[in-house]
Curated annotation (Swiss-Prot):
Name of this protein: Holliday junction branch migration complex subunit RuvB
The gene coding this protein: ruvB
Region (Disordered) location: 1-25
Keywords: ATP-binding, Cytoplasm, DNA damage, DNA recombination, DNA repair, DNA-binding, Hydrolase, Nucleotide-binding
Region (Head domain (RuvB-H)): 263-352
Large ATPase domain (RuvB-L): region residues: 1-189
UniProt EC number: 3.6.4.-
Region (Small ATPAse domain (RuvB-S)): 190-260
SMART domains found in the cross-reference section: AAA
Role played: The RuvA-RuvB-RuvC complex processes Holliday junction (HJ) DNA during genetic recombination and DNA repair, while the RuvA-RuvB complex plays an important role in the rescue of blocked DNA replication forks via replication fork reversal (RFR). RuvA specifically binds to HJ cruciform DNA, conferring on it an open structure. The RuvB hexamer acts as an ATP-dependent pump, pulling dsDNA into and through the RuvAB complex. RuvB forms 2 homohexamers on either side of HJ DNA bound by 1 or 2 RuvA tetramers; 4 subunits per hexamer contact DNA at a time.
Pfam families: AAA_lid_4 (PF17864), RuvB_C (PF05491), RuvB_N (PF05496)
Phylogenetic lineage: Bacteria, Pseudomonadati, Pseudomonadota, Alphaproteobacteria, Maricaulales
Residues engaged in binding ATP: 28-29, 70, 73-75, 136-138, 179, 189, 226
Amino acid sequence: MTEEFDQTEAERLVDRDMQPGDGRDRALRPLSFSDFVGQKAAIANLKVFVDAARRREEALDHVLLSGPPGLGKTTLAQIVAREMGVGFRATSGPVIAKAGDLAAILTNLEPRDVLFIDEIHRLAPAVEEILYPAMEDFCLDLVIGEGPSARTVRIELPPFTLVGATTRAGLLATPLRDRFGVPVRLEFYDEAELGFIVTRAADKLGIGATPDGAREIARRARGTPRVAGRLLRRVRDFAEAEDADHISEAVADRALKRLEVDAIGLDSLDRRYLRALTESFGGGPVGVETLAAALAEARDALEDVVEPFLIQQGFIQRTPRGRLATGRAWEHLGLVPPQSGQPAAPGGLFGK
């Protein structure tokens, strides 16, 4: 039975952040370093560190995984625990509201266990403070009581490995960042790597994909395995609706066109943004507030969700005067850019 296609405005198919349904196909995730596709340098180094720690029968040094959403940070943390042959506990920064919450988690760890904290940059400062001695000395310093009768109690912890994941490493406090002995930066995947991931996932889903069909999905996946998996599930729905026994290039192309994901991974919101910038404002410069009003979208949604990929792909520039469309944006839309020297487009004087 196929999954029902249901996409709200807040759940874009090409969004790199986790969405409901992304975790349903856990069997598709790699289980070992040898199964993990891409990130060759990072994986090679991690294998050395894990093998060395396992031979010494010590806890692996603390690991910081950073990079854009959807590249496999959670999966990699699970693989580290599995390769070490130890337990795995997972939580996230926003969930740990109080120092006591973290203390409860830490005191229940077994020796050499892996504790994974997603979105570690969102830890509260009070929680970070209790984490410092836990990471460095494997102990907790807790204050019991209040006022003159307050006293400090030190609790010894078993050696453990903290694996932190963040999409915004720059927001980590320096004392916290410095306590990670193994920093790992994950990069976007190339089309060949994503094609391999799609092919393998399609086989596990029981439908199969031709090399051209897998490549058609891969090149629209924004360099992100999570997006590739999401697009594959939707294309599978269309393939089964057409009684196709595999995903061919034609099947994938028809499905993705109906889903309004174009040849390079732009969706309808991306194209609306570019058309507003080029057709309504002459390519800019135009303030993001003006664009948000024209598109009836929140400014934060444009800055955090839409613009990063457009900037990365060279479609727009952020300037002190506002947003500017590049030549590639005009070309992608099939439009002719204005000649240099034309008057500034309306809206260019509005604030960023």
